[in-house]
Curated annotation (Swiss-Prot):
It is found in: Cytoplasm. PANTHER family: CELL DIVISION PROTEIN SEPF (PTHR35798:SF1). Residues 25-115 are annotated as: Disordered. This is Cell division protein SepF. HAMAP family: SepF. Residues 47-63 have a biased composition (Basic and acidic residues).
Length: 218
């Protein structure tokens, strides 16, 4: 009996050692497994965090780009509006300037034309001499380069002949011209006026043949 007990104790001792070794192996294996699992979890958690960070950065960049675009578009719009507003103003200003220039040029042309016409303008005076002294007034008009249409219907023959001779001599001295245009009418013109009269037959019912003009007799 004592021998069996000792033998059983020895067996149990060796059995406990094996069990302890097995337990130690199991514990070691579990220790090794736990860090690996933790490492795998950590390793798996890190890639998840990196894409999140990338998404956050992308969102931030997109927002910043949108903000810059939103800031740029109003400026572009305002510049377009300013250009559109300024362009019609410039067009109206150009039209107004052209109108002013055209009106001023027209006014200048009118003034120049009026001045030229005034300087070159020739007047025709119609005179009905009644006495010999009226001939001097007619010659004075010729001196200032005026045309004179003379009608001798209110003069007698002798007075009309004397007046006509005086006017004819003055016209030659002043390089004018005296032409008959009617039965009792003569045209006295200065040297700067040319008179072209068509040839026509003037009726000479009561004409004095010697002096070649018709006078009403009183």
């Amino acid at each position: 009996m004592a021998f069996k007990d000792t033998f059983n104790k020895m067996i149990s001792y060796f059995d406990t050692d094996e069990v302890n070794e097995v337990e130690e192996d199991v514990a070691a294996s579990t220790d090794n497994v736990i860090p690996r699992s933790q490492q795998s979890v950590r390793a798996s958690s890190h890639p998840k965090q990196e894409p999140r960070n990338n998404h956050v950065q992308q969102d931030h960049q997109a927002r910043s780009q949108e903000q810059t675009r939103s800031q740029m578009h109003p400026k572009h719009g305002t510049s377009e509006r300013y250009y559109q507003q300024s362009q019609p103003k410039e067009g109206h200003e150009m039209v107004d300037r052209r109108k002013r220039m055209s009106t001023s040029s027209i006014a200048n042309r009118r003034e120049q034309y009026q001045q030229s016409t005034c300087s070159d303008q020739t007047t025709i005076a119609l005179k009905y001499p009644r006495k010999y002294e009226d001939a001097q007034e007619i010659v004075d008009l010729l001196i200032v380069n005026e045309c004179v249409l003379i009608d001798f219907q209110f003069m007698l023959d002798a007075q009309a002949r004397r007046c006509l001779d005086f006017i004819d001599g003055a016209s030659k001295v002043l390089y004018g011209s005296l032409q008959k245009v009617g039965s009792s009418m003569y045209l006295l013109a200065p040297s700067n006026v040319s008179v072209n009269i068509e040839e026509m037959t003037i009726p000479h019912t009561t004409q004095d043949i010697g002096f070649d003009f018709d006078m009403k007799r009183r």
